[in-house]
Amino acid sequence: EFPLTPTTKTSEDSFMKSHGRAVQPFVPDAKVIFDPTGKAKTSLEEIGKYTINMYRESPYITDANTSMPELELGSAHKLKKFCPTIHKLMHHMLGNGNEEFERFINWLAFIYQTKEKAQTAWVLTGIQGTGKGLFYTEILKPLFGDQHVPMRTLENLEEKFNIYMRSAMFLVLDEFHMGSSKERKLADKLKNIITERTVVVRAMHNNQIEQKSYTNVIVLTNKVDAVSLEQTDRRYNVAPRQEHKLIDVHPEIIDELSNISKELLNFAGVLNNFKYQERLVKTVFQNQAKETMRNLAMEMSEQFAMHILTGNLEYFIDILDIETNNI
């Protein structure tokens, strides 16, 4: 497919000639949008009012097995019966956290059904080989569509141009570590991507445009201190860290990976019928994994201030034991 970018009549003539097509005497203007909700559709019926929606529904969404049972928070684990390989991979990737698995499925179901922004993000952390990459390539991208699930690195996020955000339902940040950023305002930029209802898209040699944002963020990382978290953070869910490789715990997974594409229609049906709780989509889960990452990502001065504010005097015991003549 060719990208939809603004162009001139001269460029269009050259394009047609390059591909052995007849040059058109008149090419009508069209408004190019991205709206996965279906509220705005592609319309080429009336010249002067042409609209092209860049959203493309994946075959798995189109042909989802909607006869799947209606699950809800607390019973999401029952999808194991219909998508055993997908369940095995995702549960392991989420650090075997049962409640985190339930909440992650609830979060995905909200996005699947509404195609809207959740305004909260997930951080998935663990050593290499825990299934994070497989989840992206074998489940998330095929299910929601390759062009709607871009993967980018920290360096990409620091760049000025972000055309990939134009049609992104998910932004997956790979090998992410906020502390390695050269950009001071990276935390604020990421907060805006997660929560703001609009996004400014900048493409090279084109004017920037502001459009509605449908982007949800998933962070994949090996780092234990990947994201700097405020004490009152309301944006990030953190799954328990997985310290064991998927293949070591489930050696049979090698022979089962080919089942994922067959299970995706059932998984799409589960998400389609899931009775999601929007309140738990919009509010983050305060678990031990998040508290651990918050503490590990803190600078020493932040730790000092936090322990004073919380009255944790034990933190200062080592300091009181220091011999003053050694200072």
Regions found by a protein language model. Give the residues of each.
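Conserved catalytic/switch belt of AAA+ P-loop NTPases
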Residues: 186-209
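P-loop NTPase catalytic core of nucleic-acid-dependent motor ATPases
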Residues: 42-176, 184-187, 237, 271
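DNA transaction DNA-binding modules
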Residues: 128, 278-327
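A short helix-turn-beta junction within AAA+ P-loop NTPase domains corresponding to the substrate/partner-engaging
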Residues: 227-246
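Intein modules and their embedded homing endonuclease domains
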Residues: 1-74
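Conserved Walker B
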Residues: 175-177, 197, 224
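Short glycine-/polar-rich loops that comprise or flank the Walker A/P-loop
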Residues: 167-169, 213-216, 231-236
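AAA+/SF3 P-loop NTPase mechanochemical coupling elements
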Residues: 161-166, 202-220
